[in-house]
């Protein structure tokens, strides 16, 4: 299937594992250039190796950038490095972070803050930067991945469902 993604720059947060990794494989298969962002350089290196081995002719179309996206300045640095590698971001896929599962009796204001920092603000810190550039160009797409816990809160995942 040709989704017209050849040579488009796709930045994927949380791209070294799980849903983000699966998205990276799919975008690479469509010919996109993919920047992966994750906290762990080790996980990023492993993902790049696995993707290069599984998706034909993709090694030169993968860039990796380690950053804790809970820190806005590190999100900005990761974006700058990704743009230096492949130019403006055409598609942003946010798949980073997860809220800690906490039983209701252990919830505290800090648990709620931690959950918002882990999932919500990691997205906001990258979206804020990218959407301005996309708006100035008049094009681009942003996909925010939300798991089942973000749609319907369970008793032990209330902050993640907020």
Stretches with model-predicted labels:
Residues 30-47:
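Conserved glycine-rich Rossmann-like NAD(P)H-binding loop of the short-chain dehydrogenase/reductase
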Residues 41-42, 66-77, 109:
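The beta1-alpha1 cofactor-binding region of Rossmann-like NAD(H)/NADP(H)-dependent oxidoreductases
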Residues 8, 88-89, 134-148:
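Active-site loop of short-chain dehydrogenase/reductase
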Residues 103-104, 111-116:
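Substrate-binding pocket helix/loop in short-chain dehydrogenase/reductase
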Residues 143-162:
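Catalytic loop of short-chain dehydrogenase/reductase
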Residues 127-128:
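A short, exposed helix-loop element centered on a Lys and neighboring polar residues
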Residues 9, 16-18:
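Conserved glycine-rich cofactor-binding loop
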């Amino acid at each position: 299937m040709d989704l017209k993604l050849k040579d488009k720059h796709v930045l994927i947060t949380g791209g070294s594992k799980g849903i983000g990794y699966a998205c990276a494989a799919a975008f690479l298969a469509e010919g996109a250039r993919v920047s992966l962002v994750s906290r762990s350089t080790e996980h990023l290196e492993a993902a790049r190796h696995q993707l290069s081995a599984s998706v034909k002719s993709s090694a030169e179309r993968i860039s990796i950038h380690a950053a804790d996206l809970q820190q806005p300045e590190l999100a900005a640095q990761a974006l700058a490095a990704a743009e230096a590698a492949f130019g403006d971001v055409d598609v942003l896929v946010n798949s980073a972070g997860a809220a800690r599962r906490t039983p209701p009796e252990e919830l505290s204001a800090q648990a709620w803050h931690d959950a918002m920092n882990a999932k919500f603000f990691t997205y906001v810190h990258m979206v804020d930067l990218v959407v301005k550039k996309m708006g100035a160009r008049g094009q681009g797409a942003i996909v925010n991945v939300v798991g089942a816990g973000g749609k319907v809160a369970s008793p032990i995942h209330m902050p993640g469902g907020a």
